[in-house]
């Protein structure tokens, strides 16, 4: 028997700690003990308490422990009732310092179990002959264009029906891989991007996507995946950080720990306690309390606290995780939360995917070291993929698994890996990390530089050959032998593999989910308060528009107005549920992650989201009823009021349920929005208000009977119109006015319909929520868009694997065709001259200071100064052909200095002297000769790489450069940064579609290079890249410098070879002061010599990274130890004097030179700027079918729905009801398609706006051409939309086919769709992001709905609101549409005894002779919204720098 569970909190909690053995005693007695009671008395007391504890039955014994209190007294504690302070004290005693005490603590845990002969359960994971293939489109078929979208959809339908092949080709991800991941050993997974690392980790953790074709098998301790629950036996830690932003770090980990439960720890502890009692062994009381706390359910906090400490997250434990909208923890901390989320559970095998991205090397070392201690001491199994492990982190691993192009190149002990490659003729250079070498040695482009056999010519060694050679290498042969001997299943520990699906009981899971949902509702209270405020505003408008003194009860028209008021109440609560859609979709990624990790079943997640929202519906509807019911003058009977209230609550709940369901089905905002609009459309149009029941066609009547709104409307109408207020008799048959109205509108005149409606709504509420649970269970998150591969990439992958000599489409890139060397060289022939000449320029800055207004929170803490100084007078010079690294730990002012020099700051105060080749810097001209590569690679997602570069060149190169030269120059730049093979690839959205991070970095550099700048600034060009990708980017940077340009890069944690590719270093310390400015020297010799000459600075170790050493020896704590200020040391050095002389020399213009001068601010004329922007917008729209194609599809479907529902209504005008129905068709179409247009355009404009900020700052164009292009590109798309909609609907509804009527109809529809779209764009331009824009815009849709003239006609609107009718664009559209179709008819109507023309004028206030004015007004609104959009884009900047 052994202690299976201890991997969780305690042991596997232990999973994080660090291996600096400390000699200090574990708990030295404090001095006060000497004067206190004698230790013998304490021992006696402890022995007595322990003896009492031993006598308790097992259940109680495991829930009691002995701890030493703050005052040294011995006390018995209840494990389940440990408070925060007690937990803190316990951890302080056990693991005071994570780096020093963790290993000793883990050893104590192990020793306690070994003393009584209990072993830890271990897991050996084997995979044999594993093949994994995917299917993808190759070449242009996969590029999303408007045409491809419809073609691919059609082919998909035909292939699903087996009528034709899908046209996808199989692509191999992993090819025949076999190996063993052993327990008690740390295995590092390495490989270049696209090698298949993530796929291998997912396969081993049993989490592969079911669309992949998999053969081969994976076993744990000889057991197949179907014999246990792999998701709970092992933990897969993803490279994506998906968390709920509104929860704190501690809450996130505690929830995870609570769901995962304690595994088998409790059973192990029972056995341990029994054996200790038999052997009469007394354990260490603190270790005993800890082990009991992590084994008893409900005490997850101890595990959480331990993991927080080990991961260094205790400093931000109570900070929100944060997301795009909420400011939270840093990216590096988020990465650690993702790791911690799985470490708090009891899993015994860990598969970790790139857990170090965004962490500095010391933190990565600390975390990996803690994992290593846990794996070694407690017998864990770990396979960890890291991007750029530093040499010291690399040395912590026992085994290396190297993958390349889906094959295993090496798997075995770390010590033998270099020996294997040397046997193949490749050697790792002195000053290169082994991990970096391993990432590059299998790559066609990077291999040659490592070839060492001088007597043999180099030839490319493909992956296949390495893989075959490894099988005959002694490590490979031994692995093969081990694999051929099956695992002895009798050695499998009973507690090693988990067989239960969930960690805790169903009731506990539900409680955990309820607690979390309640917490999130409290954190999101702003949303609920905002919704209530919005309701109050709408209620104020409703009660003053439908004011009781203005509402008599004399005839059917009066009843119609009351009916409108009821309809408004229902619709308001129906649409109020729309917020549920966005909120549900936002939470789905976290749900899918936790569902797949088996934290909880879908029902446990769905029930709390439903049940906890019920009280909110009561509050919202209560506010509405309280404000409107009696003011509008509905039936005063209290019972009827409460019935009205109940119906509103139910419709509100039905709406929430429906939108949650649509979120689960759509899973994406655009798709769900479209579904949402369809749902609202069918509910509304067929609900019985817009078109009466008798008028609904037979083939649509099912829609009427299945619309929840119909039941609500029937019930609410019956409740009101069968009341006392409406019992005035209207004819001899004894019919009351209320009954007559109900019959007239096709509503059932039976009082039981109230309860039928209530029953139906309850049924719908339950049904929608039940379906929500089912879809959460069935559906997986949407894929990463179309899987596409270019023909070239496929050939290159194949060539890499087999060594086939493919002539790749990489024109001019010698490196590809003949495997030329690609190390980052400083020397070599300088590439002089490209197609376009440029002037080399230097930039000098002397005593530059930058300050901002003192933040309010610092003033609150007693800081008296008004300004906060971020740069304290820095000086330096950057010269042509010299590559300068700008370095310093985070927060030292690197990016600030660069923004100041480049003129990118939008606020703050700048002082000091900045000169360009001796002349004072002028920002207008400087933008023309400089480039700035931002850290976040911001590009238009829907254009190709080549188009991005062509566009940048078009707008930034001088007007005299003709098109041919421009294209030649773009080709040269693509060559320089190795983008030729990606020429036709779509850029895509970062991390979602399109280019990889490293490819985006190179595109960012190329976009600046095609402007032919003399000075380039780059902000962290290598962050987030693996060693090989970083080398490719640095090679592009080096090539750029060698053309004679001035290049400055900020850089974070570089490897040795990247660091030494720089010529000079500009090192800053906290507070924005320089501490070293000068040349690096060969192998960093100048830098090392400078710092080692300072008294007390520790010498650099052999083969240590000088960049890491330099940051370590210049920290603030080192300054305190040495008692000096490095900034002072620098100011007193010869280096400082040399730099001052250099600045002086470069600050005087060379004789005969002229200051920079450009005749115009921009390189292209206003018209050319407009054309270029329009060209890019056209490309973007054409390749964005999820927007353009969805909109056309949506329009056609709505046109067909409307055309069939309102079939032939245009010819009917014998009664006023016919006219109202026809008007309803127009009102519903305008509102629906209009709002849909406004909603879907918002995310598009929002994404493009961030690109606009970058391009405008780069001096590509002024704001107006961009705004005009954005406005104009919509016109042809909306025109097509109008033609599709207009032709279908006009012919199906059967309006008169006269040219004037048809053209007026098309005119109004076109401009209405257009102004709605521009309104959506305007809302984004005036707000910081599309989320806020959607909320602001939605408020107006509701108000426009009231004043459109359909729910209440203009003559019936109280005089104090009538002005708003004229300010409502929808009212003008409805006026124009109704009058242009019906305004001239003089037929008499049967039910009101007046002509159509007179009825329109009396009841609706519409006059035919006013039509031209109406037409002009619709155009005015279109121009107004477009102009406000353009003005806002020009004047408002929501970017903060």
Curated annotation (Swiss-Prot):
GO MF annotations, alphabetized? ABC-type transporter activity; ATP binding; ATP hydrolysis activity
Residue ranges annotated as transmembrane are 526-546, 559-579, 614-634, 646-666, 671-691, 756-776, 1187-1207, 1215-1235, 1275-1295, 1302-1322, 1332-1352, 1363-1383, 1413-1433
- The entry's ATP 1-binding residues are 191-198
User: What gene name is listed for this protein?
Assistant: TUR2
Q: Which GO terms describe its cellular component?
A: plasma membrane
Query: Do you know which SUPFAM superfamilies this protein is assigned to?
Result: P-loop containing nucleoside triphosphate hydrolases
Compartments annotated for it: namely: Cell membrane
This one is known as: Pleiotropic drug resistance protein TUR2
One Pfam family linked to the record: ABC_trans_N
Q: Which InterPro entries match?
A: AAA+_ATPase (IPR003593), ABC2_TM (IPR013525), ABC_trans_N (IPR029481), ABC_transporter-like_ATP-bd (IPR003439), ABCG_dom (IPR043926), ABCG_PDR_1 (IPR034001), ABCG_PDR_2 (IPR034003), P-loop_NTPase (IPR027417)
Q: Which family does it belong to?
A: Belongs to the ABC transporter superfamily. ABCG family. PDR (TC 3.A.1.205) subfamily.
Q: Which organism is it from?
A: Spirodela polyrhiza
Q: What induces it?
A: Induced by abiotic stresses such as cold-stress, cycloheximide and sodium chloride (NaCl). Induction by abscisic acid (ABA) is repressed by cytokinin such as kinetin (at protein level).
Q: Which amino acids does the record list as binding ATP 2?
A: 888-895
Q: In which tissues is it expressed?
A: Ubiquitous.
The principal location of this protein is membrane
């Amino acid at each position: 028997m052994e202690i299976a569970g201890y991997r969780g909190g305690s042991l596997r909690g232990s999973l994080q700690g660090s291996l600096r053995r400390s000699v200090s005693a574990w708990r030295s007695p404090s001095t006060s003990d000497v004067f206190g009671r004698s230790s013998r008395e304490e021992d006696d007391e402890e022995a007595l308490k322990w003896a009492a504890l031993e006598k308790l039955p097992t259940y109680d014994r495991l829930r009691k422990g002995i701890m030493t209190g703050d005052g040294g007294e011995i006390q018995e504690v209840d494990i389940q009732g440990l408070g925060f302070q007690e937990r803190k004290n316990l951890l302080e005693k056990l693991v005071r310092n994570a780096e020093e005490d963790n290993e000793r603590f883990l050893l104590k845990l192990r020793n306690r179990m070994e003393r009584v002969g209990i072993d830890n359960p271990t897991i050996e994971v084997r995979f044999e002959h594993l093949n994994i293939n995917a299917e993808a489109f190759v070449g242009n078929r996969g590029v999303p264009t408007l045409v491809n979208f419809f073609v691919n959809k059609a082919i998909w339908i035909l292939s699903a029906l087996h009528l034709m092949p899908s046209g996808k080709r199989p692509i191999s991800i992993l090819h025949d891989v076999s190996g063993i991941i052993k327990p008690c050993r740390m295995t590092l997974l390495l490989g270049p991007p696209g090698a298949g690392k993530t796929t291998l980790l997912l396969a081993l953790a049993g989490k592969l996507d079911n669309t992949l074709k998999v053969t081969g098998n994976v076993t744990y301790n000889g057991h197949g995946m179907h014999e246990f629950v792999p998701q709970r036996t092992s933990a897969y830690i993803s490279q994506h950080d998906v968390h709920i932003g509104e929860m704190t770090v501690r809450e996130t980990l505690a929830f995870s720990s609570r769901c995962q439960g304690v595994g088998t720890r409790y059973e192990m502890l029972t056995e341990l306690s029994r054996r200790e009692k038999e052997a009469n062994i007394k354990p260490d009381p603190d270790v005993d309390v800890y082990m009991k706390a992590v084994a008893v359910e409900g005490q997850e906090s101890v595990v959480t606290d331990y993991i927080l400490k080990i991961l260094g997250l205790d400093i931000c434990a109570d900070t929100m995780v944060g997301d795009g909208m909420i400011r939270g923890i840093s990216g590096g901390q988020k990465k650690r939360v993702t790791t911690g989320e799985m470490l708090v559970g009891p899993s015994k095998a860990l598969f970790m995917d790139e857990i170090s991205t965004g962490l500095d090397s010391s933190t990565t070392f600390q975390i990996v070291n803690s994992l290593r201690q846990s794996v070694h001491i407690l017998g864990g199994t770990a396979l960890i993929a890291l991007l750029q492990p530093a040499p010291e982190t690399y040395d912590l691993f026992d085994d290396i698994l190297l993958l390349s192009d889906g094959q295993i190149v090496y798997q075995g002990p770390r010590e033998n890996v270099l020996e294997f490659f040397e046997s193949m003729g490749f050697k790792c250079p002195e000053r290169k990390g082994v991990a970096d070498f391993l990432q590059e040695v299998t790559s066609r482009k990077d291999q040659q530089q490592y070839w060492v056999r001088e007597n043999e010519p180099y030839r490319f060694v493909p992956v296949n050959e390495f893989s075959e050679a490894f099988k005959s290498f002694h490590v490979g042969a031994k692995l093969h032998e081990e694999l051929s001997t099956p695992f002895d299943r009798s050695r499998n520990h009973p507690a090693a593999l988990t067989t239960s699906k969930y960690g805790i009981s169903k009731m506990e899971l539900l409680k955990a989910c309820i607690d979390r949902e309640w917490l999130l509702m409290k954190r999101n209270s702003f949303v609920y308060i905002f919704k209530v405020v919005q309701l109050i505003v709408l209620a104020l408008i409703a009660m003053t528009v439908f004011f009781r003194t203005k509402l008599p009860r004399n005839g059917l028209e009066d009843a119609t107005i009351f009916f409108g008021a009821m309809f408004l109440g229902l619709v308001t609560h129906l649409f109020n549920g729309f917020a549920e859609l966005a909120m549900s979709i936002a939470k789905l990624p976290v749900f899918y992650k936790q569902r797949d990790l088996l934290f909880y079943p879908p029902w446990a997640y769905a029930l709390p989201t439903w049940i906890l929202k019920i009280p909110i519906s009561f509050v919202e509807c209560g506010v509405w009823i309280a404000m409107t019911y009696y003011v509008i003058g509905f039936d005063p009977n209290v019972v009827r009021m409460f019935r009205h209230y109940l119906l509103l609550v139910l419709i509100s709940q039905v709406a929430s349920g429906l939108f949650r369901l649509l979120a689960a089905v759509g899973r994406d905002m655009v798709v769900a929005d479209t579904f949402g609009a369809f749902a609202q459309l069918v509910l509304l149009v067929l609900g019985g208000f817009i078109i009466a029941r008798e008028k609904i066609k037979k083939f649509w009547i099912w829609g009427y009977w299945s619309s929840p709104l119909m039941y609500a409307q029937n019930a609410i109408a019956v409740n009101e119109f069968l009341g006392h207020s409406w019992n005035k008799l209207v004819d001899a048959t004894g019919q009351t006015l209320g009954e007559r109205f109900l019959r007239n509108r096709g509503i059932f005149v039976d009082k039981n319909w109230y309860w039928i409606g209530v029953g139906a709504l309850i049924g719908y509420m339950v049904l929608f929520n039940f379906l929500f649970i089912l879809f959460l269970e069935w559906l997986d998150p949407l894929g990463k868009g179309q899987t596409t591969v270019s023909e070239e990439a496929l050939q290159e992958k194949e060539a890499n694997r087999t060594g086939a000599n493919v002539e790749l489409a990489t024109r001019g890139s010698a490196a590809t065709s003949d495997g030329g060397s690609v190390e980052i060289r400083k020397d070599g022939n300088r590439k002089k001259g490209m197609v376009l000449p440029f002037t080399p320029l230097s930039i000098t800055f002397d005593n530059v200071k930058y300050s901002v207004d003192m933040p309010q929170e610092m003033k609150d803490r007693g800081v008296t100064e008004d300004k906060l100084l971020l740069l304290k007078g820095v000086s330096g010079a950057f010269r042509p052909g010299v590559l300068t690294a700008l370095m310093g730990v985070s927060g030292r002012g690197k990016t600030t200095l660069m923004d100041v020099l480049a003129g990118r700051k939008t606020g703050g105060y700048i002082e000091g002297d900045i000169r360009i080749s001796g002349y004072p810097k002028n920002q207008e001209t400087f933008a023309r000769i400089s480039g700035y590569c931002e850290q976040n690679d911001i590009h238009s997602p829907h254009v190709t790489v080549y188009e991005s570069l062509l566009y940048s060149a078009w707008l930034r190169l001088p007007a005299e450069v003709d098109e041919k030269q421009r294209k030649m120059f773009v080709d040269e730049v693509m060559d320089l940064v190795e983008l030729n093979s990606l020429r036709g690839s779509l850029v895509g959205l970062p991390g979602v579609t399109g280019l990889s991070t490293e490819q985006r970095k190179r595109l960012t550099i190329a976009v600046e290079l095609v402007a032919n700048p003399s000075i380039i600034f780059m902000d962290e060009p290598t962050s987030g890249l693996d060693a090989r990708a970083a080398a490719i980017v640095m090679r592009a940077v080096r090539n750029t410098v060698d053309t004679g340009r001035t290049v400055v890069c900020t850089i974070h944690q570089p490897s040795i070879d990247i660091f030494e590719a720089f010529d000079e270093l500009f090192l800053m310390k906290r507070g924005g002061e320089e501490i070293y400015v000068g040349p690096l020297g060969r192998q960093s010799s100048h830098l090392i010599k400078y710092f080692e000459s300072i008294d007390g600075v520790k010498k650099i170790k052999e083969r240590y990274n000088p960049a890491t050493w330099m940051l370590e020896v210049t920290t603030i704590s080192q300054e305190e130890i040495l008692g000096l200020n490095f900034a002072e040391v620098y100011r007193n050095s010869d280096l400082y004097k040399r730099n001052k002389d250099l600045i002086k020399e470069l600050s005087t213009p060379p004789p005969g030179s002229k200051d920079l001068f450009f005749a115009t601010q921009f390189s292209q004329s206003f018209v050319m700027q407009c054309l270029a922007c329009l060209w890019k917008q056209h490309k973007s729209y054409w390749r964005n079918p999820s927007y353009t194609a969805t909109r056309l599809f949506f329009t056609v479907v709505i046109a067909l729905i409307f055309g069939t529902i309102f079939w032939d209504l245009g010819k009917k005008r014998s009664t006023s009801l016919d006219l109202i129905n026809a008007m309803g068709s127009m009102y519903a179409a305008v509102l629906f398609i209009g709002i849909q247009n406004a909603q879907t355009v918002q995310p598009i404009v929002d994404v493009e706006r961030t690109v606009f900020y970058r391009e405008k700052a780069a001096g590509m164009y002024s704001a107006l051409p961009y705004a005009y292009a954005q406005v104009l590109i919509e016109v042809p798309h909306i025109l097509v939309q109008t033609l599709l909609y207009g032709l279908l609907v006009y012919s199906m509804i059967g309006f008169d086919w006269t040219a004037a009527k048809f053209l007026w109809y098309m005119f109004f529809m076109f401009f209405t769709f257009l102004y709605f779209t521009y309104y959506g764009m305007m809302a984004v331009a005036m707000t910081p992001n599309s989320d806020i824009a959607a909320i602001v815009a939605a408020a107006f849709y509701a108000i426009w709905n009231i004043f459109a003239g359909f729910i209440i006609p203009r003559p019936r609107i109280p005089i104090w609101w009538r002005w708003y009718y004229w300010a409502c664009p929808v009212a003008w559209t409805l006026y124009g549409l109704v009058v242009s179709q019906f305004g001239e008819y003089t037929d008499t109507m049967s039910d009101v005894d007046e002509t159509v023309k007179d009825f329109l004028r009396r009841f609706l206030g519409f006059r035919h002779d006013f039509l031209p004015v109406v037409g002009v007004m619709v155009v005015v609104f279109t121009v107004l919204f477009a102009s406000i959009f353009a003005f806002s884009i020009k004047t408002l900047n929501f970017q903060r720098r």
